[in-house]
């Protein structure tokens, strides 16, 4: 069924719905295209010399060659068949079952006209960029923190305390800077650590025992020495005086390197018969603790007035040696050597101080001799300066006298020339004054002659000039009078137009439009901005539909007033019962007259009626505008009409005032 529908639509449209790929490039099986539709292969113009291009044949993205054969174009010379092609089957001959597919001969597939697949989108390496950026920012921030920590102390404390590995990095850079600034100190061999890490052994007989110390008095005696079993110092340790100087130097070097000569020396062979007398036994429970001789330490060297760098360096070296000796408990052997070294250092320090004092004295003598020589040179220089000053003063005096004489002569010449010039100017001025006086006398004579001539002519010329001025004044007065006449005529026309509008408003019993009268008024006052503004302020509805007259407003007010009195006692949210009660009670109210006082509805209506009878629409509108609730709602339309009338009256009053 579906295939039959497709065949029928293909036969009616003279154009197959689906084109097989095999017939796409052959001219004899080309699709029938109407002449009115232009495809991609058509030329844009007849005058275009470029050959037609098929879709995909001129694409830069494909390299497939064009298929063989002619290319079918809409302007081809092949005739268009009037009937469908032979492959088209009528709708009544379409079989119910589809025909079997034909066997296609093997061959290369037809070239595809589909566009190449789009290039794959680049992968978003978000995590790599994120971690790279984070690493770079962390490195820059850490490096900047280390650099700023070496400049600012407060930031140094914060950075080393809260930032991980911050203290190690800052210490490393500070140590490198210290080594760079002091290469001699940094190149010196590092001092051996004083803490060797060995376990401390406490003798077994040291400390306090629980037994009383005088329990053994009977057996040992009163003056028994607690150190009687100890070996003499001469037997245990060799004194420094008994050794040779080479041995002592060697022992000091061994001590500095961390090896004790006592430990490295071979032990004497022990005889099996005799036991050493200094062998100590472990104390028993009831045996008191024994006291040992206190080991005296060698005090560090402290030389007074040792401010010299060389002496300080020697003192530091000796103090290091003393510290090593104290650490090895070899005080007894090196005490005399250290004392001798201290004495030598004191002597060296004193000698350096003496040399320093001698150098200071020699420097003082040199300074004094230099001062004396400088004083002599200064005195000689001052004497030379005074001599030169005297010579220059004499020279300047001579030059001054010569210059003064020259200036005096110049001033004499200038004074003489100025006097001559002044005399000449005075003479010229006198001549000019005389000439001016002569001219003035001549003018006075001519004026006198003219006056006499005028008097002789009996004032004929004066009368002619007066007549001319009078004629000019008359011309000016005539021009002003014409202007006044034109202005009065224009004012009269304007007044007539305004009165026509007012008459139309007052005489009309029903509202009538006054568009023609208003147009005439506007034409008359076309160049008057006040009148144009007044006409523009009128509501277009007012002059298109008209406004009621005063009598109509009063008549309508009376009808509105009766309704307002009925609703005067109604609240804002009143029901049917309230309306009925208000209607009944309004009949019982007394009516007021004149300008009644009060803010009730009856007083306001009475005052409004009085204002209307007097012709005061503005006052009536103000009174009615003071109503509230249902009374104001009922009088809203009447107030709107009154406002329109007031707007028109105000617009007409403005030209009236202008007039």
UniProtKB/Swiss-Prot annotation:
Residues 150-659 are mitochondrial intermembrane. Keywords: Coiled coil, Membrane, Mitochondrion, Mitochondrion inner membrane, Transit peptide, Transmembrane, Transmembrane helix. The keyword ATP-binding does not apply. Residues 1-40 form a transit peptide. It is a single-pass membrane protein. Residues 41-129 are mitochondrial matrix. It comes from Sclerotinia sclerotiorum (strain ATCC 18683 / 1980 / Ss-1). GO terms for cellular component: MICOS complex. Residues 96-120 have a biased composition (Pro residues). It is found in: Mitochondrion inner membrane. The chain crosses the membrane at residues 130-149. The lineage of its organism: Eukaryota, Fungi, Dikarya, Ascomycota, Pezizomycotina. Residues 41-123, 187-290 are annotated as: Disordered. Belongs to the MICOS complex subunit Mic60 family. GO terms for biological process: cristae formation. This is MICOS complex subunit mic60. The keyword ATP-binding does not apply.
């Amino acid at each position: 069924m579906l295939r039959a529908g497709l065949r029928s639509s293909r036969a009616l449209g003279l154009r197959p719905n689906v084109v097989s790929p095999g017939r796409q490039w052959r001219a004899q099986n080309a699709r029938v295209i109407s002449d009115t539709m232009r495809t991609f292969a058509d030329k844009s113009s007849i005058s275009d010399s470029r050959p037609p291009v098929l879709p995909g044949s001129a694409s830069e993205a494909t390299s497939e060659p064009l298929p063989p054969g002619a290319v079918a174009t809409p302007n081809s010379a092949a005739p268009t068949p009037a009937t469908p092609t032979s492959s088209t089957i009528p709708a009544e001959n379409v079989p119910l079952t589809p025909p079997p597919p034909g066997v296609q001969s093997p061959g290369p597939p037809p070239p595809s006209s589909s566009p190449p697949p789009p290039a794959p989108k680049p992968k978003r390496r978000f995590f790599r960029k994120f971690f790279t950026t984070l690493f770079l920012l962390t490195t820059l921030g850490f490096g900047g923190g280390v650099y700023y920590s070496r400049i600012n102390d407060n930031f140094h404390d914060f950075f080393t305390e809260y930032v991980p590995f911050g203290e190690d990095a800052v210490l490393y850079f500070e140590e490198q800077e210290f080594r760079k600034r002091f290469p001699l100190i940094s190149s010196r061999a590092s001092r051996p650590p004083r803490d060797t890490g060995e376990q401390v052994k406490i003798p077994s007989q040291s400390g306090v025992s629980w037994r009383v110390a005088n329990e053994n008095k009977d057996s040992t005696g009163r003056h028994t020495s607690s150190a009687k079993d100890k070996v003499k110092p001469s037997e245990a340790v060799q004194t420094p005086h008994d050794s040779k100087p080479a041995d002592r130097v060697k022992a000091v070097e061994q001590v500095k390197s961390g090896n004790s000569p006592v430990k490295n020396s071979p032990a004497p062979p022990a005889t099996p018969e005799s036991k050493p007398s200094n062998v100590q036994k472990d104390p028993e429970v009831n045996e008191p603790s024994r006291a040992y001789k206190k080991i005296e330490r060698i005090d560090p060297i402290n030389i007074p007035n040792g401010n010299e760098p060389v002496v300080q360096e020697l003192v530091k070296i000796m103090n290091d040696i003393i510290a090593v000796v104290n650490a090895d408990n070899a005080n007894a052997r090196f005490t005399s050597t250290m004392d001798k070294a201290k004495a030598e250092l004191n002597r060296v320090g004193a000698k350096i101080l003496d040399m320093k004092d001698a150098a200071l004295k020699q420097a003082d003598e040199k300074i004094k001799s230099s001062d004396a020589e400088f004083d002599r040179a200064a005195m000689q220089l001052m004497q030379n300066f005074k001599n030169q000053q005297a010579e220059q003063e004499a020279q300047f005096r001579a030059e001054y006298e010569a210059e003064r004489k020259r200036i005096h002569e110049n001033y004499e010449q200038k004074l003489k020339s100025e006097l001559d010039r002044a005399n000449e100017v005075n003479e010229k001025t006198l001549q000019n004054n005389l000439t001016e006086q002569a001219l003035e006398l001549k003018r006075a004579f001519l004026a006198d002659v003219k006056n006499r001539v005028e008097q002789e002519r009996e004032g004929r010329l004066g009368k002619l000039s007066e007549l001319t001025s009078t004629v000019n004044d008359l011309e000016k007065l005539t021009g002003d009078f014409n202007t006044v006449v034109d202005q009065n005529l224009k004012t009269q026309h304007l007044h007539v137009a305004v009165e026509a509008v007012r008459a139309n408003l007052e005489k009309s019993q029903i509202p009538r439009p006054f568009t023609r009268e208003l147009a005439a008024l506007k034409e008359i006052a076309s160049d008057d901005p006040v009148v144009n503004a007044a006409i523009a302020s009128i509501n277009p509805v007012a002059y298109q539909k008209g406004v009621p007259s005063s009598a109509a407003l009063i008549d309508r007010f009376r009808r509105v007033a009766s309704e307002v009195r009925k609703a005067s006692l109604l609240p804002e949210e009143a029901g049917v019962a309230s309306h009925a009660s208000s209607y009944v009670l309004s009949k019982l109210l007394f009516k007021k007259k004149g300008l009644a006082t009060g803010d009730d509805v009856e007083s306001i209506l009475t005052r409004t009626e009085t204002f209307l009878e007097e012709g005061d629409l503005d006052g009536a509108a103000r009174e009615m505008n003071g109503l509230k609730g249902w009374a104001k709602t009922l009088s809203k339309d009447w107030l709107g009409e009154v406002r329109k009338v007031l707007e028109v009256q105000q617009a007409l009053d403005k030209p009236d005032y202008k007039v």
